[in-house]
Amino acid sequence: EINQLYQELTSVPWDNKYWDTRRQKVLNKRARENLLFLKGVSQEADYPNKKGRIVDINSLSKFDEILTQLFDIINQETDGKAQYLIAEGNRYFKKKMIDSKLKNVKNGIGWHGDAERRKVICLCIGGVQYPMHWQWFYKHKPLNLNPYKVALNSGDVYIMSEEAVGQRWKNSSEYTMRHSAGDVSFTKYKKEWIEHFTN
């Protein structure tokens, strides 16, 4: 089933560009592609007007079926806490066409929290030992040099609570959790963080 789901989700175009609010222009996405999925809603991308693509979940029969099964299981165990969630996809590549040549690329996302959401249910599709890291932070620094690490494979599911997702990660005076994923260039600690523990 997971292979069928992979084929279905990769058959639709994903957002590989975005509107950069700082530079005020459309730029290419380098580390990953994104896509939003909603039931009964579709939208073509219009990057100059800050609009990404939306795919109607009803048009993806296998995705709709698996989401329904997954949410039913989670809702039974959590008294309905998986209701009214939005499906968002992050697509990572090991190789990409750059200047008409297929090249190896580093992909991932650096240490951050998700201020825009309070809970996350993630289904890994097509991943092979894909690294996910979590760490507590206080006053812009990690609490230690040993983040919690998980290697995700296709079919794995993980759930992040409000604390795990790092919804308040910008409040540096509080203990908050951040996460990172992918290549070591994204998950490694900053030089000043390491120096904080070694000096």
Regions found by a protein language model. Name each.
Residues 1-199:
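Non-heme Fe(II) oxygenase metal-center motifs and adjacent flexible, charged/small-residue loops
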